[in-house]
UniProtKB/Swiss-Prot annotation:
The protein, known as: Arabinogalactan biosynthesis recruiting protein Rv3789
Ranges facing Cytoplasmic side: 1-2, 48-61, 113-121
Location of the protein in the cell: Cell inner membrane
Any one Pfam family match given in the protein's UniProt record, by short name: GtrA_DPMS_TM
Function: Required for arabinosylation of arabinogalactan (AG), an essential component of the mycobacterial cell wall. Probably acts as an anchor protein recruiting AftA, the first arabinosyl transferase involved in AG biosynthesis.
Protein family membership: Belongs to the GtrA family.
Keyword Cell inner membrane attached: yes
Keywords assigned: Cell inner membrane, Cell membrane, Cell wall biogenesis/degradation, Membrane, Transmembrane, Transmembrane helix
Source taxonomy: Bacteria, Bacillati, Actinomycetota, Actinomycetes, Mycobacteriales
One GO CC term on file: plasma membrane
């Protein structure tokens, strides 16, 4: 349940910043998604390490998380771009593409963090 709450909070940070950067600031869509993903994942990592998994700081774990986030970064930005293109960048496509990209990355993150990363000492 803690992972879901943490993911929800990080998702709000990610989506909120994405919309502000893309729609309000006028940044290019992939750059907006990239920046919002980075801020959202840093938020998620800090909360997950301290609250969700209650893990002590670890250099090995930090490196593993950064590698995982690098992979999910590509998944997120790529899926978001693909979905927006397939849906012709309509206004309603923004949250749809975000949910698909975020949902896919969240599943990958949870499985790898639970099974591998937070078992590292």
């Amino acid at each position: 349940m803690r992972f879901v709450v943490t993911g929800g909070l990080a998702g709000i940070v990610d989506f909120g910043l994405y919309v502000v950067l893309y729609k309000v600031a006028g940044l290019q869509v992939d750059l907006s998604k990239a920046i919002s993903f980075i801020v959202g994942t840093i938020t998620a990592y800090l909360i997950n390490r301290r609250w969700t998994f209650q893990a002590e700081p670890s250099t090995a774990r930090f490196v593993a998380v950064m590698l995982l986030y690098g992979i999910t970064f590509a998944v997120q930005v790529g899926l978001n771009h693909l979905c927006l293109a397939l849906l012709h960048y309509r206004a309603w496509a923004i949250p749809v593409a975000f949910v698909i990209a975020q949902g896919t990355a969240t599943v990958i993150n949870f499985i790898v963090q639970r099974a591998v990363i937070f078992r590292i000492r």
